[in-house]
Amino acid sequence: MKRVFLFLITNLAVILVLSFSARLLGVDRFLTSNGLDLGMLLAFAALIGFGGSFISLLMSKTMAKWSTGARVILRASNEDESWLLNTVRQLSKKADLAMPEVAIYEGAPNAFATGPSRSKSLVAVSSGLLRSMDRKQVEAVLAHEVAHIQNGDMVTLTLIQGVVNTFVIFLARVFAYALDSFLRRDEDESGSPGIGYWISSIAFEIVFGILASIVVMYFSRKREFRADAGAAALIGDRRPMIEALRALGSIDAGKLPKEMAASGIAGGGMMALFSSHPPLESRIAALESAR
């Protein structure tokens, strides 16, 4: 969940900055100078949407380290760190990947993988995960994260987010223009849009962005099943991954970070639509039924 959450937050921030910069440069004024030019607007939305998404991807590893306080293991200082490095190295070799950076951060049981490409990636595990699981289970979690890198999930997420961003920016400005035109219906509409357009376009971007995250989260849940299967393939046995998921499910939900509710520990109903992970029971069932 952490890698997806960080990506979405970074993406939203970048999009808002790019959109605001475009306003300062007069792009919106140009698009609406003779009525709303939908063709030009779509091109502008795609440029900002995909640009923001790829900027977020390039920043993903740096943001992850900064937000978690993760410490990259450059040289093992104890037996646990040595085991972590060797395990990730072996799994990466099996996955035909370059050795990713390996980091540890303080926190409740969790792990994530991120990075702009398969050759420039990061695998991070929390101290809580290392304390609460045995090594076979931790190896399965590491294999799951390596499988995310092998499957190119961050790049896939970036492309999906780029498409979503494009429609969010496009629709936000269409709705904002319509609202501004309605508010100014008794005035001279030959000039540039009024203050209603500037305020409402930002508001619509935020609201549509939150709603559009449902689409991104849906694809994220699908990729989790693939990463589970990939972990089983890398280890050569699905049982360690199943045991790791069961161990995660047995941990007191109160001891988990809030984002781990998305892994199926807690939550449901409408909130499940905003979850980046399927329920643990569904993931275990998928592994057990795999052949």
Curated annotation (Swiss-Prot):
Zn(2+) binds at residues 144, 148, 224. InterPro entries: HtpX_protease, Pept_M48_protease_HtpX, Peptidase_M48. One of its GO terms (molecular function) is metalloendopeptidase activity. The active site is at residue 145. It is a multi-pass membrane protein. GO terms for biological process: proteolysis. Pfam families: Peptidase_M48. Its main location: membrane. The keyword Cell division does not apply. It is found in: Cell inner membrane. GO terms for cellular component: plasma membrane. Signal peptide: none annotated. Binds 1 zinc ion per subunit. The chain crosses the membrane at residues 4-24, 38-58, 159-179, 199-219. Keywords: Cell inner membrane, Cell membrane, Hydrolase, Membrane, Metal-binding, Metalloprotease, Protease, Transmembrane, Transmembrane helix, Zinc. Coiled coil: none annotated. Its cofactor is Zn(2+). Its EC number is 3.4.24.-. CDD domains: M48B_HtpX_like. It comes from the Bacteria. Disulfide bonds: none annotated. Belongs to the peptidase M48B family. NCBIfam families: PRK05457.1. This is Protease HtpX homolog. The gene is htpX.
